[in-house]
């Protein structure tokens, strides 16, 4: 801790000290223990919990898409049809969803992959945009030709059947089993950004698997990018009818994952029947600091603190709960600090001939 000093004369030097008693004029020094002084200035405050706010002078992001009503951040990240919009740039992002949140669309097996981490991954970037073109032509991909499937459980903006914008449900026109095939995922971002490519696969009960794909056996899938390879085998059947958006209930499930492609790097996906091929990709650049918090963001604050919310800095130090903080924040200390702004106190009955340095404290 940097010690703050006030020079009161050539002979007296008073330094920051910790409070020793209820008296505001007693400080504990490193060399002379408890010392009475003629005046002190408090240097610490104990904050009270408040709402979170926008960080002063900094673009602060709450929801990924503020204008996407009734949408979770995962809805936005996957491109749910009713949750398409612009993600504003931000230097600071609030991790506001306290627990893993599902997507209100086709039932997803969230625990099979890291897909719930996707919104947090996007929050960590300053600039995020969805590509205007598809990364793969799903209809003519290996193993096709395919029809791009839609679902009543994932309605579009006109309440017709839809599907996620980031993926194409590849339903083969020829209902036959297929050995694993490979498709390359090119890099299509145009500004040197990281490319986040979403993909997945669908599985259902044996009857539906035969109807949709001509094969009722478990299917194998693999993704690879930047030296990271992930393998999956689909689960056949055993799912209760379910919907995540009060739409048409589904007996099937989808597993969704993503790969991160660095500029110019190609990814690969090895798949069998039921693949959800990548379509629009996220192009992301810059860094955004992420802090746990809550919405709405009200007003502005000097500092965002995970335990106290938005803080305005009134003192250089604070006591209380120690946690991550972003911005112009006070420094956490265990014990309240005060700055002596007077001289060493001398009782009137006792004359002191020598006036000298009486120590700095341990911070």
UniProtKB/Swiss-Prot annotation:
Tagged with keyword Protein transport: no
Highest taxon above the source species: Viruses
Main location: virion
Location(s), subcellular: Virion membrane; Host apical cell membrane
Membrane topology: Single-pass type I membrane protein
Keyword Signal listed: yes
MF (Gene Ontology): host cell surface receptor binding
Modifications the protein undergoes after translation, according to the UniProt entry: In natural infection, inactive HA is matured into HA1 and HA2 outside the cell by one or more trypsin-like, arginine-specific endoprotease secreted by the bronchial epithelial cells. One identified protease that may be involved in this process is secreted in lungs by club cells.
Gene Ontology BP term (one): virion attachment to host cell
Glycosylation sites: 36, 70, 156, 174, 205, 241, 312, 341
A Pfam family it matches: Hemagglutinin
Keywords on record: Disulfide bond, Fusion of virus membrane with host endosomal membrane, Fusion of virus membrane with host membrane, Glycoprotein, Hemagglutinin, Host cell membrane, Host membrane, Host-virus interaction, Lipoprotein, Membrane, Palmitate, Signal, Transmembrane, Viral attachment to host cell, Viral envelope protein, Viral penetration into host cytoplasm, Virion, Virus entry into host cell
InterPro entries reported for this sequence: Capsid_hemagglutn, Hemagglutn_HA1_a/b_dom_sf, Hemagglutn_influenz_A/B
Recorded GO CC terms: host cell plasma membrane; membrane; viral envelope; virion membrane
Leader peptide range in chain numbering: 1-11
Additional record remark: Major glycoprotein, comprises over 80% of the envelope proteins present in virus particle.
Protein family membership: Belongs to the influenza viruses hemagglutinin family.
Subunit-level organization: Homotrimer of disulfide-linked HA1-HA2.
Function: Binds to sialic acid-containing receptors on the cell surface, bringing about the attachment of the virus particle to the cell. Plays a major role in the determination of host range restriction and virulence. Class I viral fusion protein. Responsible for penetration of the virus into the cell cytoplasm by mediating the fusion of the membrane of the endocytosed virus particle with the endosomal membrane. Low pH in endosomes induce an irreversible conformational change in HA2, releasing the fusion hydrophobic peptide. Several trimers are required to form a competent fusion pore.
Name this protein carries in UniProt: Hemagglutinin
Source organism of this protein record: Influenza B virus (strain B/GL/1954)
């Amino acid at each position: 801790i940097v010690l703050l000093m006030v020079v009161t004369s050539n002979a007296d030097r008073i330094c920051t000290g910790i409070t020793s008693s209820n008296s505001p004029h007693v400080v504990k020094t490193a060399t002379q223990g408890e010392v009475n002084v003629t005046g002190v200035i408090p240097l610490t405050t104990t904050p009270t919990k408040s709402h979170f706010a926008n960080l002063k002078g900094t673009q602060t992001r709450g929801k990924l898409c503020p204008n996407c009503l009734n949408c979770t951040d995962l809805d936005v990240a996957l491109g749910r049809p009713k949750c398409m919009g612009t993600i504003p740039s931000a230097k600071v992002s609030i991790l506001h969803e306290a627990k893993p949140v599902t997507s209100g669309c086709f039932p997803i097996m969230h625990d099979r992959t890291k897909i719930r981490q996707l919104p947090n991954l996007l929050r960590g970037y300053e600039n995020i945009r969805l590509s205007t073109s598809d990364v793969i032509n799903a209809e003519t991909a290996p193993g096709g030709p395919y029809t791009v499937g839609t679902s009543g459980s994932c309605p579009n903006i006109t309440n017709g059947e839809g599907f996620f914008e980031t993926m194409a449900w590849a339903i083969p026109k020829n209902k036959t089993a297929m050995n694993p095939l490979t498709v390359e995922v090119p890099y299509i971002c145009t500004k040197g950004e990281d490319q986040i490519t979403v993909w997945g696969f669908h599985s259902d009960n044996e009857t539906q698997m035969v109807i949709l794909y001509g094969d009722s056996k478990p299917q194998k899938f693999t993704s690879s990018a930047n030296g990271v390879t992930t393998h999956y085998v689909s689960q056949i059947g055993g799912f209760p009818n379910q919907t995540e958006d009060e739409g048409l209930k589904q007996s099937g499930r989808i597993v969704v994952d993503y790969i991160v492609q660095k500029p110019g790097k190609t990814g690969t996906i090895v798949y069998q029947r039921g693949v959800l091929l990548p379509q629009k990709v996220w192009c992301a650049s810059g860094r955004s600091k992420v802090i746990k918090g809550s919405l709405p963001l009200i007003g502005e604050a000097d500092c965002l603190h995970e335990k106290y919310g938005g803080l305005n800095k009134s003192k250089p130090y604070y006591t209380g709960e120690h946690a991550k903080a972003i911005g112009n924040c006070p420094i956490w200390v265990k014990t309240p600090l005060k700055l002596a702004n007077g001289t060493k106190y001398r009782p009137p009955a006792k004359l002191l001939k020598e006036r000298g340095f009486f120590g700095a404290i341990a911070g």
